[in-house]
Amino acid sequence: HVRALNLHTVGLGGDSEIKIEEQVLSVGPKRIAPVSWLGEKMDAHKAIDFLERHIDDYSSSSEPAQLFSATSFGNGSEAGHSDSELALTDQEHHIIDLLRERPYSLLELGWKMGMGHWMMVPVHKLEERHLLQRSGLTPTDLLHHRGQLDLWDAETAEHYIRLLSRRAKYGMEELTKRVFEIIEERVATELLRKQLVHGDDLSTKGKCGLCGEMVKNILCRGNESLTLSVRFHYPV
């Protein structure tokens, strides 16, 4: 017999995308580059300054505030493909030319290219071909803000977190606290699901209000009426 680990992945990590949609926070499963990493590579403050000046132009979603930069492929140093092989449109070439200068947000790209809405900016093919890199708010940036991590540029992370907190009408500490609560609840829920569901059938992923309240009770060590606890039969 071959010994193996019985694994179940959750899709949460330091590079998980943190999004704000209508003041509702979500974490993952998409992965993006942390803005602290971007700030270590190049100056992103002009892009964030633009977002601050146009803060009323993206009221319902944080996606247009995500930042884009040209990769080494997009800069041409390692492309290995001719323009004809890449078959980029004039608009896509324009995006790459802009990003070779400095990072831009999706909102500013739309404004710079004279498009009516940021959703019209054609970045998806460029992402798929690794010609540009998407950056945004991640748990790594929040750890830089807390002083618990010192890998990259904490100043850029602070600048960006302050912007998104203002846009979402959260305080910086409130936003940070809520994100880590979401991560904690997700990890705890998946740990319990893995132990409770036999075999590989983990398809019961619908939201359950009672289940969520039970997880919160366990993590918060109870409330005035009830205290729940969990004991695993082996290490996890």
Describe each model-derived feature in a short phrase.
Residues 1-236:
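N-terminally biased helix-coil "hinge/interface" segments that flank
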